[in-house]
Every structure is written in structure tokens, then in C-alpha cells.
Amino acid sequence: MTSTTPRAALTTSADAGRPALRVVGLRKRYGDVVAVDGLDLTVASGECFGLLGPNGAGKTTTIEICEGLTASDDGTVEVLGRRWDDDEHALRERLGIQLQETQLAEKLTVEETVRLFRSFYPRGRSVDEVIDLVQLGEKRNARVGKLSGGQKQRLALACAMVGDPELIFLDEPTTGLDPQSRRQLWDLIIELKASGRSIVLTTHYMDEAEKLCDRVAIVDHGRVIALGTPRTLIASLGAEHVVEFSSPGSEEVLRAEELEALDGIQSARLHNEEWALEVTELARAVPALLRELARRGLPLEELVTHSATLEDVFVSLTGRQLRDA
């Protein structure tokens, strides 16, 4: 008989008040490559925490060490108040893990797959409940090999949830999905948050982090370079908007300091012949920019504006676009 006893009731009194995850001084090398370089972070119980950064930043290595799948070279990792060498079996029963690439047996059906994963846990949720939760009820008898990419990702999430975990690791959960599938998966993660589960996810989609995460750590070259809520990190720019424009020839005659001297413009960066301006007031900055271009006889090829995002925070910290990092 399947037990659906809430995980909160299974947590020992010794765990009360402890963070879901604590990482101190984490280091990992692969030959001459430093994947993780003295990384520290703490995830509170019930928090959705995001590790953000480009491919190769060290996100996946960090999360695999936290999941007990990879050994670190140095540092301390405590998961739900315990270390992996204390009692790995008991700890693994309390976790849900969705890998960046989850290879499921393609000849099994959806129901058979979830039932298989349910058998790994002494307690958990019912197979039917989890299948319905990830909106695969109509596909319960379909073989995994016949599912779409988005459906396979939802099935992988079901396998991570079926043990009713206290802490769930999601590594790049929406990579490769179309926009509709991404949003469907976002809705499922939001439901998990509402249930009080602790979630650690990695992503290089800044909009995903802004939508889902209570706090984020921006990781670059194996280090945390910024930590906080999405709102506070964006506010740290000191600019509410970003103006991006291209003007042929401007990169040869304009300097960043000259643009920063214009009314309403806080900072200016040139990247691949395109300027990005952090501005405090669009109504002042855009007219000032247009006047300056006209004064210099420079043509305006394109101009777009958007509210400041975590992507802009990353660019401000590193001088690189996330997609180019």
C-alpha cells in the first residue's frame, strides 16, 4: 500500500530550523580546469534557490556535488543538515533529482516509469497523483520514446517528485523546450514551491530565474559573483531601464564616458558594435542620446528599450553577454 504521509511529518526534530542546503568553500578541478573555486551558498528551508550563469560556469558540477553524484576536492556540503558520508541511503530517500539529461527507458510507458521510480522509496506519493500533477494523465499508457521533449521533461519531474522529497534539485529543467512547454514546467515548479518544498535549480535563462526563484546566486568561473533576490540584484544596477542601439561608425568616434555624461544615462558599454546604456529615466535619456547622435551626424540604425533584468546584472558584473560567456 502506498503511503502519502507528508514529508514534513517525517523530518526529525534535529532538522528543525536548519537550512535545506549549506555549501562552504566548495572546490573541484578536472585536470587543469577549475570547475568550482571556493563556492559558498546557503538555501533556506522552503526556498526556491537559483544558480545562474553561462554554460561552463560551474553550475552543474556544483549541483552534482550537492546531489552526492560527484566528489568535491575540498569544502563542506550539508544537505538537510547531513553530510553524504553520514548516511547516504537515508538522505537520498529525502531528495528528488532531475538531471540535466535524464535518460529514461524508452520502451516503458509513462505509468511504468513512474511506478519504477516510486519503488525506490519506502514512502511517497501515489503514482496516479503524480502523473496527474504533471499533466500526463492522457499519456499514462504511452511509451516514453513517443513523448515530446516537453512531455519527457514533465515525466522526469514526476520521477523526481514521486518520493515526496523535502529538497528537489532541478538542473537546467527547461533547456531545449519550446516556449509553451517551458511555461507549463514553470507552472509545475510554482506548485512545488507552494507546497513548501525546497528547490535548487540551475538555469542560464534569466527570465526563468526571475519568475521562479526567491533568491539567486550568479555564478561565473566557479565563483558566486552576486547573491540576492532578483529584485534586489536588479535594483543594485541603479537603473530601471536599458537602452540598446546600433549606429554605424559610432564605435569609432563615441566613447563610453561621453555617453555617460548625457542626461539620464548612468553607464554605457559597447559589445559587438552595439551600445547598451543603463538609464534612470527613459524620457530624459532617449532624447539626449538622439540629440548627441544628430549633433555628430551619426545614423541611428536600431534602438530598443527594456526594463532592467538579471541578464543586465550579469553584463554589468562581467562585461559579457550571458549568451557569449
Predicted regions and their residues:
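A generic structural signal for secondary-structure junctions
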Residues: 96, 122, 235-239, 264, ...
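ABC transporter nucleotide-binding domain
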Residues: 187-280
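Short beta->alpha junction loops/turns
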Residues: 84, 120, 248, 282, ...
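ABC transporter nucleotide-binding domains
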Residues: 18-23, 28-226
